[in-house]
Amino acid sequence: MVLIPTVAVVVVVALVAGLVRFTNWRAQVRAAEAAQLELTRTYDFNPGNIISDGQFFNGSAMSQAEVQSFLDTQGGSLAAMTFDTSNESGEGLCADYTGTKGESAAAIIDQSARACKVSQKVLLTVMQKEQHLVTAVDPSDYQLMAAMGLNCPDTADCDPAYAGFFRQVYGAAKRYRYYLEHEEQYGYTAHNLNYIQYHPNAACGGAQVYIENKATALLYIYTPYQPNIAALAAGNGTGDSCSSYGNRNFALIYTCLLYTSDAADDSLR
């Protein structure tokens, strides 16, 4: 009788266990992808691919003049507003920002986008999602102070280091780059299964989502909930007590206001 060496047995067992885990993982991925496909067909919303990398990380998606024209057409007060900006370090994530007095909102949006290689359309979408700034007439001080919702928790004041329109816009663009460089530090990763809640109340449940790209992972790091069926069925309206709307509204605003055919490029820029 020939005895198989113990080491060989251990290796075989490990290989079999690994194969079983991979097979189970692939089955879960296929189930998540099937559910996401059904949501896309029914509600035109894919929780695993809210926006492509090519759309999100295109710092040349619009020119400053195009940003200004877009703001003008929306009828909000932001189109005519100016802000004093300051010198800010890009901290190796973005190009440094050179401040000046009386800089237009369009210039701040465009320069922040180019400095951090984040789409102007994304920045416009986020400020509309967070504070309705694109369309707001006579926005409040708080709307401007918390323009992008950056470091502005629901239960406390905004961090003074990020308060104000300029610091919110440039800071948010830089934060997205930080997330991109340090994705592994957060709970949501691309090309992987991620359990994403429907609401801050864990009792509302959630679902596994196969996140298809880095841009979508960043949106979940920034706003860590997915819309439930009630939120999706409501369109741009109100769902139920377990609904959240941040990422649904991002998709709706981006698609309705800012989507153009340049989205075909799905590369990281």
Where are each of the predicted segments found?
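Hydrophobic membrane-insertion alpha-helices, especially the h-region
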Residues: 3-18
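N-terminal export signals and maturation junctions of secreted/periplasmic proteins
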Residues: 17-107
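Extracytoplasmic/secreted envelope proteins and their assembly/folding machinery
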Residues: 64, 68, 106-110, 120-124, ...
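Short secondary-structure junctions and interdomain/linker hinges
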Residues: 74-81, 179, 183, 261
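Second-shell loop/turn segments in exported
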Residues: 91-101, 108-115, 153-162
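Catalytic and binding regions of secreted/periplasmic enzymes and modules that target cell-wall glycans
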Residues: 123-258
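Conserved small/polar residues in nucleotide/adenosyl-binding loops
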Residues: 259-266
